Amino acid sequence: AFVLTLLVPIQMVGQTWDDHDRSGRYTCRDFGQNYLKTLPEEGNPIIFTHGDNDTFPLWYNLDTEGFRTDTRVCNLSYLQTDWYIDQMKRPAYESPALPISFERKDYQTGTNDYVYVRPENKQVLLKNAKTEAERERVYNSFELNEILNYWIKEYHMIPTDTIWFKLDKDAILRSGMFIPYEYRGATDEETKALMPDRMYISLANKNILMKNEIMMLSLIAGCNWERPLYMSVTVPSEMYLNLGGHFIQEGLAYRITPFNYKKLGYNARDGEGTVVDTEKMYKNLMTFNFGGLDADNLYLDETIRRMCYSHRRIYIQLAGEFIKQNDYNRAKVVLDKIEKEMPASTLPHDIICYSTEMAKMYYMLEDE
């Protein structure tokens, strides 16, 4: 009986060791660093995340490795809770507190868990305005800070589906974000003159705003383009707050900008309207590490494979952008890097990670 009992764990170890052996694999650590490497080194940037795999590796690097402790990871799932908002309003390492304008009484459990979006009330307000000055006051009440500090805090509702706020053009220029070509002048003053004066946030087709979305609006107002805001590429599009057209990709994250690239007609990677800052993305991707994926006989479970495919996909995407610009040399450099770091012997090619496009690019580059 003793021998039979001993054989059971031996059998289990013998049959399952290979698919539990993580020796030599540091992908989670490095992938977490790759997200943080996407963020600029100035301005104490904030990155919105959503799930476990785009959050916990980042937290590990902040808390254990001490890597990029100037940044802040803000999980949108947790941002629904008062205790997590409390954390975000406190400094952490070299990261200052997040500029959320709400006091605890305005976001404690049971308060502003959600607010209604009632655009029909806009017409009622305008109809009741007797003079031009009163109508002007109504329109001014739809400014972002007025929405946050008056309508939400006092009435727990939003009487419009279009919010606006005035742009700090000097802060935008200092931020280092990609300025659309349409707004670029010969001097900073010319550029500012070409920029729009306001940013508009559409709440169309939204009946309610959840607490995390309210906090996102508060952060957009509080950061004022001086503290960069990013959205992880793994966040579902339904959590974009209709800002997808304002995203520009710089790696494993989209920078949130005041410019609607989609309306400007910029070529989108997908239906969300995201475009690529090729210079920043190239600089970032060439510094990424891959946790030993080029080693032989490395076991990759389903979760790691999915994270690997996300990485391979953005390299192929960047190479495609360079090909559009006729920059064939850098397109090949990008493809060669990901193929070297993530060889097919470790991670087989698959249609879900644009491998067909990768093959077409290599074929085309051979002719250039």
Segments (PLM) and residue ranges:
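ER/secretory pathway lumenal C-terminal domains and tails of membrane proteins involved
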Residues: 1-44, 56-368
